[in-house]
Amino acid sequence: MTTRYWALGSAACLLALVHGVPAHGQGDPPATSASASGNTVTFGGQILMRIRTGSGGFTAEQRADQVAQRLIPILSLKNLKPEDVTVTQTRKYQDATISVRGKLLVTVDKGLSQANGNNDPGDLARAWADNLRKVLPEISVQANPNDKQQ
């Protein structure tokens, strides 16, 4: 079992424990299934991103593993909102990063952007961030309204 499978499986278990699974007849359980195949990072059956190239001595699959590992603490952040997902790029055609509430998720370099059909890493990072802005708030931990320490 690869680290990515373990990491995403752990995130699914964490979400199941936090959200709870309804008893029989109380509706559908929350979507917490996670999987990854090769260089594709998925959660709850939704593709988050495809890491098509290696970089910095890491293979594409190892980079996807890193993203999956970084995703676990991000998913434990309470009440994620679309604006919590940010893209940083200092200049056009330079590397871009995607962060969630200041936590680095992935760095998009020129090789990765070109392998995904983009010339500018910022364009690919913004496309991935748009997808994450839709998905992460749906699957992140929701704060208990009775919890006074939010």
Set out the residue ranges of the language-model regions.
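Bacterial N-terminal signal peptides that target proteins for export
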Residues: M1-S10
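N-terminal targeting peptides and non-cytosolic leader segments immediately upstream
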Residues: R4, P22-Q150
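Core hydrophobic alpha-helical transmembrane segments of single-pass membrane proteins
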Residues: A12-L14
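C-terminal segment of classical bacterial N-terminal signal peptides
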Residues: A16-P22
